[in-house]
Amino acid sequence: MPSVSRAVCVQRASGNNGRRCRDGAAAAGRRSVVAQRARHGKPEVAIRSGSGGSARGGHCSPLRAVAAPIPTTKKRVFHFGKGKSEGNKAMKDLLGGKGANLAEMASIGLSVPPGFTVSTEACQQYQAAGKTLPAGLWEEIVEGLQWVEEYMAARLGDPARPLLLSVRSGAAVSMPGMMDTVLNLGLNDEVAAGLAAKSGDRFAYDSYRRFLDMFGNVVMDIPHALFEEKLEAMKAVKGLHNDTDLTATDLKELVAQYKDVYVEAKGEPFPSDPKKQLQLAVLAVFNSWDSPRAIKYRSINKITGLKGTAVNVQTMVFGNMGNTSGTGVLFTRNPSTGEKKLYGEFLVNAQGEDVVAGIRTPEDLDAMRDHMPEPYEELVENCKILESHYKEMMDIEFTVQENRLWMLQCRTGKRTGKGAVKIAVDMVNEGLVERRTALKMVEPGHLDQLLHPQFENPSGYKDKVIATGLPASPGAAVGQIVFTAEDAEAWHAQGKDVILVRTETSPEDVGGMHAAVGILTARGGMTSHAAVVARGWGKCCVSGCSSVRVNDASKIVVIEDKALHEGEWLSLNGSTGEVIIGKQPLCPPALSGDLETFMSWVDEVRKLKVMANADTPEDATTARQNGAEGIGLCRTEHMFFASDERIKAVRQMIMASSLELRQKALDRLLPYQRSDFEGIFRAMDGLPVTIRLLDPPLHEFLPEGHVEDMVRELCSETGAAQDDVLARVEKLSEVNPMLGFRGCRLGISYPELTEMQARAIFEAAITMTNQGIQVFPEIMVPLVGTPQELGHQVDVIRQIANKVFTDMGKTIGYKVGTMIEIPRAALVADEIAEQAEFFSFGTNDLTQMTFGYSRDDVGKFLPIYLSQGILQHDPFEVLDQRGVGELVKLATERGRKARPNLKVGICGEHGGEPLSVAFFAKAGLDYVSCSPFRVPIARLAAAQVLL
């Protein structure tokens, strides 16, 4: 049994490389805390923060109390322990997810080490006060500390009765690895000596050197590599391979060397006063909120509206006190597959960061059952309690100290798309949740993952498998090797697919991880930083591949006996852990029966229809398979590029010097267009198909290259004289083509162009109708800015319709409408609705023209705008609700005043973006239209807005 001084330090956590931190929290378990204390002595305290930000930049300036804004909530420090807490799981906004769940676990009687949480509002006040602690906060923190000291009968800084703390962050939204944990806070020379007298030299000085490393890196911003160099040098001198082989004498020497690092790196000694350590750690947590990696993580995941991070200060328990101690991470169900079975990893005689950072290779959770049967049984029971209580799949961190189980953290577990759908369906079938609740358990992005490709023939590449690691995040990825996050982002910006190869990842790598199609790491388990982040994003990831040796400096990775350089192709199977040399072919994934069940529940709830943007029969078929209720945008110009003959006919039409020559070229195009429309009508039998007339500027159909080459090619294709072709090309040249001769302006200038397209549509529709296909054509006129423009095109279309109906002896129903993509059209929507039977918002161009941003040039300044908070989102990805959204609402209202039965939808890129879909549903639109593969995402988003 440990003596009182053996700190009950729950060391669960992210260490130096931005790893996910794990720590202990405060609450007595089903066994009373009093009994625990009697048996196991007094735990030490652990401090954690509750945010998702990086923990850089605490620095050494002392805390200064200054006047601060009046807090929204007067109480800013909330303690937990003794089987009851001052907070609960509903207080995530105030306590952060970590703090709220620690309080909840303590309240329901689980074994949680005691501690306190500093609220997110305190962080908000700190930021508002120019990064100065608000008045009175430090005194409140000291009171919280005294409460813990009194309960534990131990004191921070007391060598005889040492209390050690862990400090971590925890915002309302989980952001793995964004803030590193500080463990063993409170150690100095005197406390370490006192701890050694009661718990042994090796344990005390191993804890001390770990604390010096973590505190220096996380709080003082000293590079972890400086400490790592000292450690590796000592092991080399001693001829040792593992950290655990170092003796107590070695560790004492290492402590002295680590303290020298502080002087060398910062010009000042390590702060030995434990309360000063606590002050600086709290500052580091608060400062982590707006660190570059925290900002990037929130930007990537579109996380906005949070107050800040909480700080969790908690009594520590130790998993590194011998073979009856250990630490682990688990999910109550398999996060990759959704299988109802505990899934996790465990390490005997280890601290939490050893699991998540890949410092040691962990064992499967089943190994714990053999090593520690009693704590394992209690853990299994706790998992059942938590899953039943939260009605969710949970991510749990725990430590066993000398056969005593401590629950350190629980939160809703991140999962893959496949796992999310299965868990939701299974929990409904188990009677644990209602269907509507299950719909909220799956994110739209999860469905995106399910639609990612898999390998075409897994058995065909077996001879090319060069290594096998852990299957950390499922799916398949094929890309070119890069070794840094910066290179991954740069190559991705050039349109290249890349595989990010690292020894291990850290939160600094999140930008590159997001840019990569797949991630391969040499170290780290199934719950490492790389694995957790990759699963959350649906990225293929193979981790813990021990045969991988990365040389970042030379940009070479050696796998077994093969040396691969930057830019070489590599394939990853995240479902099996296989690393395959070369570029393996991919195919679309097969969708599960669980997804079909889940999507049927989605469709029972949603009211907004979901259509698809599809230009070919193949696209239309895919869209229908994914649940599209019609085609909301069929772009006719894409059909012109389908063959050389077609594009030559288009160019002849463009180069035509007379109506006769132009009509001749259009007559050649007519059968091509008619055939394409027949295929699409056939694929969408019984569903509406909205066909947009020609929209792009004519110059887009001309050959690329130098003018001389272009003229030579056009002369060859059209037989026209060189001077005539050159004059025509110069006439087509425009200063700003996106605002130039395009859309309905083409159809008005060349009515025969609209006539040809309308004839192709109506002839195809009647032909299909005669074959028993139900056809509902809708013709959409693009780039309308005045009712007169639309009126002109409507007249042309209806005249052709009547001619075709007469010639073919059959009449069919059809609609004529317009795209609303010019701000003026939105403002005069009531007048336009007199001619239009439907509106479809082209939000791509509407965004361009409303902001005055060119999509082709926005990349020059948009990253700056996003990083400085001038814009919260890329407006071409997420609809600008305040500006563009207001035009959408205004046009819808005015249009329906003039035509009450006006059908209104949207066909821009925003049609598949969840936040935008939710807005369109609330705005009263009838449908959204998006790419075929985003149809399930839009369906779910349309349902979730009603929950």
Swiss-Prot record:
Outcome of gene disruption: Plants have a floury-white endosperm.
InterPro entries: ATP_grasp_subdomain_1, PEP-util_enz_mobile_dom, PEP_util_AS, PEP_util_C, PEP_util_CS, Phosphohistidine_dom_sf, PPDK_AMP/ATP-bd, Pyruvate_phosphate_dikinase
Region Disordered, residue ranges: 39-60
Localization in the cell: Plastid, Chloroplast; Cytoplasm
GO terms of molecular function: ATP binding; kinase activity; metal ion binding; pyruvate, phosphate dikinase activity
Family: Belongs to the PEP-utilizing enzyme family.
Feature: transit peptide: 1-71
Catalytic activity: pyruvate + phosphate + ATP = phosphoenolpyruvate + AMP + diphosphate + H(+)
Main location: plastid
Note from the entry: The reaction takes place in three steps, mediated by a phosphocarrier histidine residue located on the surface of the central domain. The two first partial reactions are catalyzed at an active site located on the N-terminal domain, and the third partial reaction is catalyzed at an active site located on the C-terminal domain. For catalytic turnover, the central domain swivels from the concave surface of the N-terminal domain to that of the C-terminal domain. A second gene codes only for the short cytoplasmic isoform of PPDK.
Entries under Gene3D superfamilies matching the protein: 1.20.80.30, ATP-grasp fold, A domain (3.30.1490.20), ATP-grasp fold, B domain (3.30.470.20), Phosphoenolpyruvate-binding domains (3.20.20.60), Phosphohistidine domain (3.50.30.10), Pyruvate Phosphate Dikinase, domain 2 (1.10.189.10)
Gene that this polypeptide is encoded by: PPDK1
Organism, scientific name: Oryza sativa subsp. japonica
Listed cofactors: Mg(2+)
Annotated positions binding Mg(2+): 821, 845
Annotated function: Formation of phosphoenolpyruvate. The cytoplasmic isoform supports the biosynthetic processes in the nascent endosperm and provides an efficient mechanism for glycolytic ATP synthesis in oxygen depleted tissues. May be involved in regulating the flux of carbon into starch and fatty acids of seeds and in the remobilization of nitrogen reserves in senescing leaves.
Active-site residues annotated for this sequence: 529, 907
Domain notes: The N-terminal domain contains the ATP/Pi binding site, the central domain the pyrophosphate/phosphate carrier histidine, and the C-terminal domain the pyruvate binding site.
Induction line: By light.
Keywords: ATP-binding, Chloroplast, Cytoplasm, Kinase, Magnesium, Metal-binding, Nucleotide-binding, Phosphoprotein, Photosynthesis, Plastid, Pyruvate, Transferase, Transit peptide
Activity control summary: Activated by light-induced dephosphorylation. Inhibited by dark-induced phosphorylation. Both reactions are catalyzed by PDRP1.
Modified residues (Phosphothreonine): 527
UniProt GO cellular component terms: chloroplast; cytosol
GO biological-process terms attached to the record: photosynthesis
Protein name in UniProt: Pyruvate, phosphate dikinase 1, chloroplastic
